[in-house]
Regions:
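Conserved small/polar residues in nucleotide/adenosyl-binding loops
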Residues: 459-467
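Conserved pre-motif I regulatory segment
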Residues: 33-64
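Conserved Walker A/P-loop ATP-binding site and its immediately adjacent core
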Residues: 92-112
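Hydrophobic positions on the alpha1 helix immediately C-terminal to the Walker A/P-loop
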Residues: 77
């Protein structure tokens, strides 16, 4: 095996904000205030300044780490990084977009929406998803366009697709054309699947020739080896893995940047430290477990959570008109049978409530249903009272419930759901209320927009896995 010593990266690259970054930031200004835009700009410049110089015609590489809280804007960060990379001469950006097809699709659509912006920026960016060797000529042609567009490549974090990508960059069509031009590799959720799972075992071996490597890690090494001038940027909310691996590992970061969450961000600190009252504990007997507590009927705690969600929609969407929709997420167990069971429960409850409300007060179940919602009313407004804010009356909320139930979209998000498929996109704007029931496809990285209520069954047997 031949070992090539790459030039160590020197901090002689000073990126500047150009037209594409300014245009993107102006659109992000609809979501962020002036301080938020300034923070996003400065942190993005810092990240790119530690990357290799795309204009240096030499073999070079570096690995850097970007740490951000869960759902705190990491995607916005690497989207802005992409625009800044374009403005500063990077020709190709590769995104490891998760281990599930729905995550790949989500990232591809976000990049198309935010960077290409319909067709407004199609001259500046060319987007490819999971390209193989057959794409080599198309990407070569794109690299030769006189306007020098940046090639955006999203790829599933799986050894087959990454190996295919490495083969494409090693092809005769691309290798000479790309040369030593700057390439970014953005690894989303970098601590998941990318690192070598045999690292600890290898550390006990006396001979490095006997080291073993996981398939995804090996494919990443192939890809890095195919790119003469590249920067590998790890994005994660859980950086322990990248930080604790051997500093000799090529995925060990040399620099790190900690992202600043927005002013309105709420995360673990909010829920578990500042506002612990936002957490409601499910009674032990109602905690689902596929082997040890396989519930036959929908537990009362889930019914109450559903009622709180619907009442939240009434308050936030219908009465206060602060948002156009709210979402609820339900995760029972990794077993897909459990997700299907919970989905049936929710659908049946929603349909039953809709029928009762359609019949009106003459329905024998009408008053009982209204009373059950009334019991949840104090919980639905508790945080308003805690912060000395006025809250709508129960009667005002109840008047909205019928329409909200009729406009509630319930989705089963599992891989074997043939009707939906892994790449089904949630049409968030279509309903005022969304309920997503799922297992691993609702794992980290998947964005549930306007999430207001989460119902998750934890036992001492499943807590470490789910966290």
């Amino acid at each position: 095996m031949e070992i090539e010593i790459l030039n160590t990266h020197k901090n002689d690259f000073s990126p500047v904000i150009g037209e594409r970054t300014m245009e993107l930031l102006s659109r992000f200004g609809q979501k962020l205030d002036e301080d938020g835009i300034d923070t996003l700009s400065s942190e993005t410049i810092e990240i790119l300044s530690h990357c290799t110089n795309p204009y240096k015609n030499e073999v070079q590489s570096v690995t850097n780490l970007v740490v951000g809280y869960v759902q705190s804007g990491k995607t916005m960060s690497f989207t802005t990084l992409s625009a800044l990379a374009h403005d500063n001469g990077f020709r190709i950006i590769i995104y490891f977009a998760g281990t599930k097809n729905n995550l790949l699709s989500q990232t591809t659509k976000r990049l198309r929406k935010d960077l290409i912006n319909g067709s407004a920026n199609s001259a500046y960016y060319k987007l490819f998803e999971n390209p193989t060797l057959e794409y080599a000529q198309r990407i070569r042609n794109a690299l030769n366009i006189s306007s020098k567009p940046t090639i955006l490549i999203t790829v599933l974090k799986h050894h087959k697709y990454i190996s295919d990508l490495a083969a494409m960059f090693n092809s005769m069509q691309l290798k000479q054309t790309l040369g030593k031009a700057g390439v970014l590799i953005i690894d989303d959720e970098a601590d998941q699947a990318s690192l070598n799972g045999y690292a600890y075992k290898n550390s006990k071996s006396e001979e490095w020739e006997d080291d073993e490597y996981t398939t995804t890690y090996s494919s990443i090494m192939k890809l890095k080896g195919a790119l003469a001038n590249h920067s590998y940027i790890q994005y994660t909310a859980t950086p322990q893995g990248p930080l604790l691996i051997s500093i000799m590992d090529l995925l060990s970061p040399k620099h790190h940047t900690v992202l600043t969450p927005g002013k309105t961000y709420t995360g673990g600190k909010t829920f578990f430290c500042d506002e612990p009252g936002l957490i409601i504990t499910i009674p032990e007997g109602e905690v689902f477990h596929s082997k040890h507590n396989n519930l036959a009927d929908c537990p009362d705690s889930l019914v109450n959570a559903l009622q709180l969600h619907l009442m939240g929609v009434a308050i936030i969407v219908k009465l206060l008109q602060k948002e156009s929709f709210l979402s609820m997420m339900i995760h029972a167990d990794r077993d897909q049978d459990a997700s299907e069971k919970f989905y049936r429960w929710i659908k049946n409850i929603i349909d039953a409530w809709s029928n009762i409300l359609a019949n009106g007060e003459q329905d024998l179940g009408y008053q009982e249903l209204k009373d059950s919602f009334a019991k949840c009313y104090p919980e639905s407004i508790r945080m308003y009272e805690a912060h000395n804010e006025s809250a709508p009356s129960f009667e005002d909320i109840w008047c909205c419930i019928d329409d909200i139930i009729l406009d509630t979209n319930v989705e089963l998000v599992i891989s074997r759901n043939k009707r939906q498929g892994e790449n089904k996109e949630i049409d968030w704007a279509s309903s005022c209320s969304h309920i997503l029931v799922g297992a691993d496809m609702l794992n980290r990285g998947f964005t549930v927009e306007h999430l207001a209520v989460t119902s998750v069954s934890y036992t001492h047997l499943t807590l470490p896995t789910k966290l």
